């Protein structure tokens, strides 16, 4: 089973992604965060296999979360959740060290393929 942490400021998006991931029992969302600060705090106590990270969040955005993780040499794999209008941030996130990205409106098959690719191969770009 793949343990996932989900960081997104929209509760409905988190709930939808959680349902998609947990439907067949192959993945489990073990922690959720609504902003970057909460994400970093929760990561002190949970060890997911992968972090699904939104870019645009209040208090601390996903880019800053990613920077902090990489500065600490954290080996956590990170898959960026994005919308079409965030291309410039997406490029920056990959340059900083994100393992890949996926559009928020992707279906469950594509989302699971992206997560599995990051876990198994180290990237989904």
Annotate each PLM feature:
Residues 86, 106-119, 123:
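C-terminal output helix
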Residues 35-38, 59-64:
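Acidic catalytic/metal-coordinating carboxylates
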Residues 13, 58:
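The feature encodes the CheY-like receiver
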Residues 32-50:
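Acidic, metal-coordinating helix/loop segments flanking the phosphotransfer/catalytic sites
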Residues 49, 55-56:
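The short loop immediately C-terminal to the conserved phospho-acceptor aspartate in CheY-like receiver
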Residues 8, 54, 82:
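Active-site residues of response regulator receiver
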Residues 41, 63-74:
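Short amphipathic alpha-helix used as the core "switch/output" element in two-component signaling
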């Amino acid at each position: 089973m793949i343990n996932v942490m989900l960081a997104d400021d929209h509760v409905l998006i988190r709930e939808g992604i959680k349902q998609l991931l947990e439907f067949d029992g192959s993945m489990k969302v073990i922690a959720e965060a609504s902003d970057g600060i909460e994400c970093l705090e929760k990561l002190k106590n949970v060890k997911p296999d992968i972090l699904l990270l939104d870019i645009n969040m209040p208090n601390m955005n996903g880019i800053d979360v990613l920077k902090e993780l990489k500065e600490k040499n954290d080996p956590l794999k990170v898959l960026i959740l994005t919308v079409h209008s965030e291309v410039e941030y997406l490029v920056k996130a990959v340059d900083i060290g994100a393992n890949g990205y996926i559009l928020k409106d992707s279906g469950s098959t594509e989302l699971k393929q992206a997560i599995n690719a990051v876990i198994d191969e180290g990237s989904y770009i």
